[in-house]
Amino acid sequence: MTALTESSTSKFVKINEKGFSDFQIHYNEAGNGETVIMLHGGGPGAGGWSNYYRNIGAFVEAGYRVILKDSPGFNKSDAVVMDEQRGLVNARAVKGLMDALDIDRAHLVGNSMGGATALNFALEYPDRIGKLILMGPGGLGPSMFAPMPMEGIKLLFKLYAEPSYETLKQMLQVFLYDQSLITEELLQGRWEAIQRNPEHLKNFLVSAQKAPLSTWDVSARLGEIKAKTFITWGRDDRFVPLDHGLKLVWGINDARLHVFSKCGHWAQWEHADEFNRLVIDFLRHA
């Protein structure tokens, strides 16, 4: 297979959905087959490609059409200020993307904020989702064991409010378990993405004031989710507590949980090969 690159897979589409009128969404796309839409997290400078470039090739080789979507306000998608909880608004944008691309049904893979988006999508549009894959998703309220917000979330908001290279480095040191993975290339790429889009930083903070994290909690509705669900968590996640994985397994009727040892908040990146094998097997056989 020809090597996939960000530029060779980059596309744009206009969506029209509640809250979005001719709103431009950027995404990366490759492959043919059942559609898998991958949804990134909410850190400064995040985007679909940077979140999932270690995964897209394996899923394409396995026979899937893969879409890495930039959420509204992130990376190359249009700017936005949200006055409702972000997971719900992002879910509407996923539906808008699917409508624009004539995708009737898709499997969703969501990390952190992207996991909150996927949960909301499964609740709001149950007929449009195939299988649901979650990695340390937000949107599950308080923890039984960890003070909230956790250390990583505090650093995330500090980086939004006072962006600096040093704060970015501190956040990534909490983000990943294996510190050797924090290379200058990783830091520089993320820092350039942050600097490229300063409006994104301001809009995220304004949106967080209008709809704070406390409004994201969908725990009481987990029993409504009918999609077969695969949940992964890093044992050493310092952004979203591990006991939220148990909350999902208790709440969703058809769910299973895999915990990665020596893993932080970015399981699909830090343990990419194992993650790819597990999720592809789940998509094929569950």
From Swiss-Prot:
Native organism taxonomy: Bacteria, Pseudomonadati, Pseudomonadota, Betaproteobacteria, Burkholderiales
Annotated site residues (Transition state stabilizer) in this chain: S112
Protein name, UniProt field: 2-hydroxy-6-oxo-6-phenylhexa-2,4-dienoate hydrolase
Molecular function as annotated in GO: 2,6-dioxo-6-phenylhexa-3-enoate hydrolase activity; 2-hydroxy-6-oxonona-2,4-dienedioate hydrolase activity; monoacylglycerol lipase activity
E.C. code: 3.7.1.8
UniProt KW Hydrolase keyword: yes
Chain positions recorded as substrate binding sites: G42, G43, N51, N111, S180, R190, W266
Reactions the enzyme catalyzes: 2,6-dioxo-6-phenylhexa-3-enoate + H2O = 2-oxopent-4-enoate + benzoate + H(+)
Species, as recorded: Polaromonas naphthalenivorans (strain CJ2)
Alphabetical UniProt keywords: Aromatic hydrocarbons catabolism, Hydrolase, Plasmid
